[in-house]
């Protein structure tokens, strides 16, 4: 089939429209199963509008099918109008790879095929450089500052004028010529891999000669805010769930939390003047280094197109397989409501920090497993390990609950900014992802980290009022012993990424840990105050974390001098959430999770092991109490009691060497 298509397209007289159609056919055969294509065709044709011989979708049809708000003024400070933003994106991506010549495209079936591939995780099959190329396409689809004004593709407009794609239409001014020669501005090879087999390189290059000012255009903050609000709300969405459920059950509290997360993320793209919008360099830098999974919710959203309610292919005779529709219904029956985040295991304490918006925010950047890093897609569950509101504000309680947890965890700290100019509403939320267990200085040897797996590296972050993310250093295994990832002491408090001073005869371990490297966090022994430190990494001091992946310290803005910021926090609440890796996968229902199931089925999971540790500690405490009660009745009894204590290692030489 491929050879035949290639033969048909030889010569450079083939039009971009014809090449775009052939490329859509290639995408369809390479990226979809026959069953998925059948469902997609049924969904498209059942709702398509028609003008002459052209069948197409407009913004109203697309928004209604996807279940996204289109002009809804109840979900934000202004109109929560995600519909036009999504439609602008698909109109641009539907013209791929001839955005300059054909964009904005009419949303035909061929355009829809390309849109689904590029907006879901199927893009890796057609883009040579994967995620990097996709970021360029996403930026171009969102850029609306400096873009030539185009008539909106509303149903009324399409009915009044012929649906026609002119062969050499000017397209978006976002794709006009530019003399930019920077390496990261050159995307001539963006889709050469997809076109090489079609023998159409010259056609593509002709279109791409003037496809450079995509990097001079900008994304308005208003447009990006509407998209972010959508992504935060539907982050847990799966292809078998109704998108409308995530909006219908929103209350004022959840909306407020979602707006807070959106504002924090927007601030990380803010270079000082929001009226200028977001340029390509900032967009690419922040997405690549700080929010790599932010667009993942689009996969589930657009995979709705691959499930048709009208088809039930299992009705065939002798068919022993379930249809896609039956599978969707089966999952829907097992799915919890969006107001009850399924990621939190039953039996956990009531969270004060962690809510749906925070979970969505974490899913945008926190790698918790491999090969699927997104915490909302890889079957990860969260178990409440410690809450200062529930378990008390003491290191004794913290030690009892946290040091007995022997699996990865996330610590969240929220409080007030402790500086003279701070107002009552100036709150901050910071945290860290710790892929290994918490260890006190007396526990064994240092942990070894698999630096080839991002989910095995620690991560330090700030969630609000500005999104900041500091990934663990690849050289973490070569750090000195006084630079542990996490340290716990009843006298010096909790330290993450800090340098631990050596104990002295007078102070023992009461010396305060000091900041090191590009990021650290310290919590005092009373759990009342914390310090969050981040720097641009130019101090030449080794540390656990890399510099923040923010536009503030991007390559174009880097300073020649070391810069650091110390944020002092008056703590309101501390929460520690355990990471429970389950055996469920995105294709299975994760909602039937049993606490007895883990990634390694031959050992109990972390919750059971922690409960076993607590039971052991209780038995040991009771045994010691009985020994002490029995000692002192006579010489023989005293000797027997002493012998038992020595055997237990509580007294004697063995105790001194522990």
Swiss-Prot record:
PROSITE patterns: TLDC (PS51886). InterPro entries: TLDc_dom (IPR006571). One of its GO terms (cellular component) is cytoplasm. Residues 318-333 have a biased composition (Basic and acidic residues). Keywords: Cytoplasm. Residues 318-337, 499-518 are annotated as: Disordered. It is found in: Cytoplasm. Belongs to the RTC5 family. May be involved in a process influencing telomere capping. This is Restriction of telomere capping protein 5. It comes from Arthroderma gypseum (strain ATCC MYA-4604 / CBS 118893). The gene is RTC5.
